[in-house]
């Protein structure tokens, strides 16, 4: 009986490890249809470019993204998925130049959930700073300042 329990525990551990590795790999893959892809492609002149910028809420979850639904609903438009899991507004500012080079007609901005998570307390702020290579821990005041800077750049 003990051997059976041990084998079941080993099988469960292997399954959990494999599932974790699978999900980790999927969420680390950048979304399809990024600004770099657009800049390297030949598109029709009459297509509107819609830049969707943000964090994991923009990037989408495993295999699905609200941007994919927009692409299906508006097939004559180009939707850039510039959602990167875990990003803060500071990180979006650091990568906005290729997006601006696409000269988007419309920008959909969804950013701030990771800034909020990093602003809860000092421990979470330091964790976000370390894990995301931020110059400083997220804070509500920094978010307002950086969001204003980002909106100025996008405007």
Predicted regions and their residues:
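Active-site-proximal beta-strand/loop segments in catalytic clefts of secreted hydrolases
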Residues: 53-55, 82-85, 110-113
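A short beta-strand-loop structural module common to alpha/beta enzyme folds
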Residues: 76-90
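Amphipathic coiled-coil/heptad-repeat helices and related helical stalk/stem segments
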Residues: 35-36, 63, 92, 147
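Solvent-exposed, acidic/flexible segments
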Residues: 59-63, 85, 89, 140-144
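Nucleotide phosphate-binding site architecture
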Residues: 58-59, 80, 114-117
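Conserved catalytic-core motifs of eukaryotic protein kinase domains, centered on the activation segment
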Residues: 63-64, 120
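N-terminal secretory targeting modules
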Residues: 1-53, 58-62, 68-73, 77, ...
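Alpha-helical cap/lid subdomain in secreted, periplasmic
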Residues: 72, 91-155
